[in-house]
Amino acid sequence: MSKRKFKEELLEALVPEIYGPAADVKPDIKPRVLKRVKKREKKEEKEEAGLLDDGVEFVRSFAPRRRVQWRGRKVQRVLRPGTTVVFTPGERSVTRALKRDYDEVYADEDILEQAAQQVGEFAYGKRGRYGELGLLLDQSNPTPSLKPATAQQILPVTEIKRGVKRENKDELQPTMQLMVPKRQKLEEVLENMKVDPSVEPEVKVRPIKEIGPGLGVQTVDIQIPVRASSSTVSTAVEAMETQPELPEAVARAVAATREMGLQTDPWYEFVAPTSRPRSRKYTTANSILPEYALHPSITPTPGYRGTTFKPSRTRSTRRRRSVRRRSRRTAPISVRRVTRRGRTLTLPNARYHPSILV
């Protein structure tokens, strides 16, 4: 026996409560419960059992239940503002079975104002930051020949506005103002002019003008081409008569038989702006290459950029004795000049391995 076995036997004899053999612990296993399956009764036995019931027939043992028993949501009842609460001991103050009184059904007179201001019973939910905006406007007129016909108004932006988490100070607020010529009356311009959709408007973007600390205004002039309406053209055509005045009787007879032909739309001679196609000039690929240095083992090809790298002597302050090594003289590279498309190219002659048969 080993020393370990001796020690185990001695410890079991001296301290049996610690080193003694473990007590037999029965495993906690639940006994398996077997459900006995009731055998199906035969049809004859069922008929005999039905005769013993003294002819009593049970249609249903209980009423059919609904498939879904939905009791509704549990809502926390909150008193509407303005409702008077009366407490009477021993009496229920809430009658849930009855409907609300008509005094409670009718709302306040300023219910719409409360909804707009989100106060009273409408004081819930997130509030959007859509208050009155204060904008710094530029009153200067970069086009002196035009006068403002309308005030500066904020353009409605069609973007989907989501919840504003932080105040966006860099947000643009575009404004619009209609300008008309100074020499024409405002009524004539608005009534007698029509927009010509065939002609594209001329857009001129002006530089940003600083109107405050860290705030600027950029003016964009959009010149919309207009055309005169039919009424103004008809008056102009009627006034152009070069015939001499006729007697009154002859003029009536001529007016009865003559048909008036009026020009409704003026004739515009529209010439499309002809722009020359830009001819892009690309330089040769050799001019794009930078000045580069080749490895000393590479012999530079004549006609191309690149020089052999030579280390400068200023790098080492200590003078070294250089032992000249005799290097084999390399044969000069043979070059041929080829003219293609009027350009002379300097190409090196290819040298092949002796194993390659040309």
From Swiss-Prot:
InterPro entries: Adeno_V. Keywords: DNA-binding, Host nucleus, Late protein, Viral capsid assembly, Viral release from host cell, Virion. Residues 312-329 have a biased composition (Basic residues). GO terms for cellular component: host cell nucleolus; virion component. It comes from the Viruses. GO terms for molecular function: DNA binding. Pfam families: Adeno_PV (PF03910). Signal peptide: none annotated. Residues 296-331 are annotated as: Disordered. Induction: Expressed in the late phase of the viral replicative cycle. Its main location: virion. It is found in: Virion; Host nucleus, Host nucleolus. One of its GO terms (biological process) is viral release from host cell. All late proteins expressed from the major late promoter are produced by alternative splicing and alternative polyadenylation of the same gene giving rise to non-overlapping ORFs. A leader sequence is present in the N-terminus of all these mRNAs and is recognized by the viral shutoff protein to provide expression although conventional translation via ribosome scanning from the cap has been shut off in the host cell. Monomer. Homodimer. Exists in equilibrium between monomers and dimers in solution. Interacts with the histone-like nucleoprotein; this interactions bridge the virus core to the capsid. Interacts with core protein X; this interactions bridge the virus core to the capsid. Interacts with the endosome lysis protein VI; this interactions bridge the virus core to the capsid. Interacts with the peripentonal hexons. Interacts with host NPM1; this interaction might play a role in virus assembly. Belongs to the adenoviridae core-capsid bridging protein family. Associates loosely with the viral DNA to form an outer shell around the nucleoprotein-DNA complex and links it with the capsid by binding the endosome lysis protein. Dissociates from the viral genome during entry. Might be involved in nuclear capsid assembly of the viral particles through its association with NPM1/nucleophosmin. This is Core-capsid bridging protein.
